[in-house]
A protein has these predicted regions:
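Pre-Walker A (Motif I) flank of P-loop NTPase domains
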Residues: 221-225
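Alpha-helical nucleic-acid-binding subdomain
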Residues: 247-304
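P-loop NTPase nucleotide-binding module
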Residues: 243
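Conserved lysine of the Walker
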Residues: 235-236
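Extended, charged low-complexity regulatory segments
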Residues: 1-206, 210, 214-218
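Walker A (P-loop) phosphate-binding loop of P-loop NTPases
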Residues: 232
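Post-Walker A alpha-helix
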Residues: 239-240
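Hydrophobic anchor at the beta1->P-loop junction of P-loop NTPases
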Residues: 227-229
Length: 304
């Protein structure tokens, strides 16, 4: 009976979240269509009115026109990325929840932290429906069981208590089931994920990241991180999720996908891991083999 009551409450929250996402998706799609029309119109106008012949004045005019188009194209690309995130959120807005009470606020109700692939937030009211799995507070889900916890926020270390850890199975915007656990919360989901891993492509492990893996993924203290392990121990998965984390953290430092490269043993391996970052809502990164790298860096006389 208690489960049915909780299930009904969770369905209400899921509906509220999906309704908000759907509303924003419609608005973003309309805005994106407008941006596309503006980019096309600006390009047409440039080719019809701007002269690319010699002369300083013409060069300045052409440069200004190109800068304007690049700015419009960047806005269009950003809108398109937001649409991709919203579509993804509409399918599975979140996969976990932790109830957290910060020290000093024990008399207040615990804050329900829903965790998903990307943040879902009302920019007007600042209500956060879902926290990105890479946010500092989301580390509570990966690193702790119920009880005393702490996480490192931009303002410093935040301490408190987790009173509930919950995981969800949500597909196509429908809640199939959830379960709570005080001990080894991710074992059930991990076993299920592994049982469905009969695929020719590597999958993301964002729902089943272990404590030690999370510490590697979020490490910002070391410039170089070496991870050792036997074959099949998850080294590549951790590396790709670390890439997603670094791109999320590196927005302020302008760290983008084209700043990162994977050195793969062969092209087949590069194809095998190609789906992970898009699953996480990030742009894919370049993958080179050692042979290609040496061919590009070294002289043509070198034979491998």
């Amino acid at each position: 009976m208690e489960y049915e009551k909780e299930f009904a409450l969770e369905q209400q929250y899921l509906k509220k979240t999906c309704d908000f996402v759907r509303e924003n998706l419609t608005r973003e799609e309309e805005a994106c269509a407008d941006e596309k029309d503006q980019v096309i119109a600006a390009r047409r106008e440039m080719w019809e009115t701007v002269s690319f012949r010699g002369g300083f004045d013409n060069a300045v005019e052409a440069h200004q026109a190109l800068e304007s188009i690049q700015a419009q194209s960047a806005r269009y690309d950003a809108a398109h990325k937001r649409i991709d995130h919203l579509r993804q959120a509409l399918e599975t807005p979140y996969f976990a929840r932790v109830d957290f009470t910060e020290n000093g606020y024990e008399s207040d109700p615990a804050e329900k932290i829903y965790i998903g692939l990307s943040t879902v937030q009302d920019e007007d009211s600042y209500e956060t429906f879902v926290y990105d799995w890479r946010t500092p507070i989301a580390s509570l889900f990966y690193r702790y069981e119920t009880g005393p916890v702490e996480y490192l926020a931009p303002s410093g270390t935040i301490r408190g208590k987790v009173s509930l850890k919950r995981q969800y199975d949500i597909k196509d915007g429908t809640l199939n089931y959830f379960f709570d656990s005080d001990v080894n919360v991710i074992d059930n989901m991990l076993r299920e994920a592994l049982s469905h891993n009969a695929s020719q492509k590597m999958k993301s492990i964002v729902e089943t990241i272990q404590r030690q893996q999370d510490m590697i993924i979020r490490d910002t203290l070391n410039d170089l991180v070496f991870v050792q392990g036997v074959a099949g121990s998850g080294k590549t998965s951790v590396a790709l999720h670390r890439v997603a984390f670094l791109m999320y953290e590196g927005v302020a430092q302008r760290l983008y996908a084209n700043n990162i490269v994977i050195i793969s043993p062969n092209n087949l391996f590069g194809s095998y891991i190609a789906n992970v970052l898009p699953e996480l809502g990030e742009e894919n990164i370049a993958s080179l083999t050692f042979e290609t790298l040496f061919s590009n860096v070294c002289s043509n006389d070198l034979r491998i």
